[in-house]
Amino acid sequence: MRTIYLILTFVCCIIAKAETFPYRSIASFNISPASESHCMILDSEGMMWVGTNSGLKSYDGYTVKSYKSNALSPGILPNNDIRSMAEDHEQNLWLGTRNGLVKINRKTGVFKTYFLPSEDQRIIYHLFVSRDGTLWVGTDGGLSYFNPENESFYTYTSRNAWRIDENGKKQRLNSFSVKCVTEDKNGDLLIGTWSSGLMRLKRGSNVFRSYPKLNDMNSAYSLFFDRNHRLWVGTWGYGVLCISNPDNQKNPQYHQYPYATNNFDIFYKFVEDPTTNTLWACTREGICYLDEDQPQAGWSKYTQIGGNPLIYCNDISTDGAGNIWLCTQNDGVLQITTPPSLFRMPLPSTT
């Protein structure tokens, strides 16, 4: 076999007709009109979990189960409004709610609730498990991590941490609201905030280093490292930008993609599809994708589904095998199966 790379002429048609993208709706996974889906995760065993404002749902491909606090099962969750989820290295599922944190022991089925100490740490916006197994928690009270030995939380504050701004000035860490956390290839943490910009925290350090200002609001709402170690930053109201040299904080090289107010200006999350080498993002106005080998070409957008607006795509996941899962507010859970690369076609050998 030899592989011949062809540019397919129908690519432009697919990009131009966003409403025709191939999808499958999971009929058994309907979300009631009174519920809103906020977040989604595919765990290490292939189970899908969806967090809503009325509890947690799981789907194994056949059966949907619901978990929530009510008269029949009081106290399972401290609050039924689930805002974030993560799976740790012991296969425990962690839920961030509007009032506390929950650990689900997958082996025993036991739910356990934890509360962070401050009032501004009640709503858990983001959960992230780093490669060393640490659970990181993002709240309006800043960045915290969970210590499993004594089941306590350590929070970086003005009493124990510092911040170096983009001009090199060092001062006590001020308050900030954490919206996302990710990890680079060296184990450093990148922290995205509501309006305090993008920061880097070296492991074992208590010094947060700020990147140059991203936009007027200094919003960094979502973060993602692609396979080329470019850092993608989704913002709240300012579209998306790519940082091509994130290791160099003095000259990180920002590339801002065009956007318009209320038109793909809020980016909730990114995933990477290795089968097509594309980057996918969910937004308030729909979903979009970008060819990672041609990032200068821009984002192609899907704004409709079945003739109806595809809005409030709150989360997105991938199994790494060409399946993209969307968690939408109005259309439930949708599956997109990406075809083999749109840009490469293997042909049989003629020799």
Residue ranges and their predicted role:
Residues 1-351:
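Carboxylate-rich, polar loop motifs that coordinate divalent cations or form catalytic acidic clusters
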